[in-house]
């Protein structure tokens, strides 16, 4: 099956998580007016008394054409990925309880100035880079096991 890749927007992505970006977002000044603070852009949620981790993930580019055959989810915490050098990347997401609901499967491409924060329990493809090795600032949960993985029928990403 073919999965159309759409431009990432907060409206299209809201069921799956938050788009982390400054475009069309409110800010206030801090540090004597030298800094614009775009405040509270995503909900970080951590369950079971675990702690929030800030890491850097160095992702390798995916081989093209890209075929998706599995999704993962994290029931005990949100997970955010923010490219550190303005790289474009692709995310694949789906809703669903015990298994991904393929009728909700969507693929989005960022504009190079966006990150994503997956809500708890949102199915998503494991992180990969798009065109070159990419460092991602990652905010997620540390502690006990927090990753469910499910195989899905193969989906080939298609770009408009």
Curated annotation (Swiss-Prot):
**Enzyme class, UniProt record, top EC level:** lyase
- Alphabetical list of Pfam families matching this protein: Ureidogly_lyase
**Protein name from the UniProt record:** Ureidoglycolate lyase
**Which gene name does the record give?**
allA
Catalysed reactions listed for this entry: (S)-ureidoglycolate = urea + glyoxylate
Question: Which co-factors does it depend on?
Answer: Ni(2+)
Specify the domain of life of the species encoding this protein. Answer: Bacteria
Q: What is its EC number?
A: 4.3.2.3
Q: Which UniProt keywords apply?
A: Lyase, Purine metabolism
What family does this belong to? Belongs to the ureidoglycolate lyase family.
Which HAMAP family does this chain map to? Ureidogly_lyase
What Gene3D superfamilies has UniProt attached to this entry?
A: Ureidoglycolate hydrolase (2.60.120.480)
Q: Which organism is it from?
A: Shigella flexneri
Name the pathway it acts in.
Nitrogen metabolism; (S)-allantoin degradation
Q: Which GO terms describe its biological process?
A: allantoin catabolic process; purine nucleobase catabolic process
Entry GO MF terms: ureidoglycolate hydrolase activity; ureidoglycolate lyase activity
- Entry's SUPFAM superfamilies? RmlC-like cupins (SSF51182)
Q: Subunit structure, per the record?
A: Homodimer.
Give me the disulphide-bonded residues: none
Q: What does this protein do?
A: Catalyzes the catabolism of the allantoin degradation intermediate (S)-ureidoglycolate, generating urea and glyoxylate. Involved in the anaerobic utilization of allantoin as sole nitrogen source. Reinforces the induction of genes involved in the degradation of allantoin and glyoxylate by producing glyoxylate.
């Amino acid at each position: 099956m073919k999965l159309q890749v759409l431009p990432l927007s907060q409206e299209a992505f809201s069921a799956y998580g938050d788009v982390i970006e400054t475009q069309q977002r409110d800010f206030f000044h801090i540090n004597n007016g030298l800094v614009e603070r775009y405040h509270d852009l995503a909900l970080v949620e951590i369950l079971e008394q675990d702690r929030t981790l800030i890491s850097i993930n160095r992702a390798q580019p995916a081989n093209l054409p890209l075929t998706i055959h599995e999704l993962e989810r994290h029931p005990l915490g949100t997970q955010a990925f923010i490219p550190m050098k303005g790289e474009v990347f692709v995310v694949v997401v789906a809703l669903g309880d015990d298994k991904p609901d393929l009728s909700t499967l969507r693929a989005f491409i960022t504009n190079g100035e966006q990150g994503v924060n997956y809500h708890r329990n949102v199915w998503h493809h494991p992180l990969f880079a798009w065109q070159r090795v990419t460092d991602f600032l990652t905010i997620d949960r540390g502690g006990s096991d927090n990753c469910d993985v499910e195989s899905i029928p193969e989906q080939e990403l298609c770009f408009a």
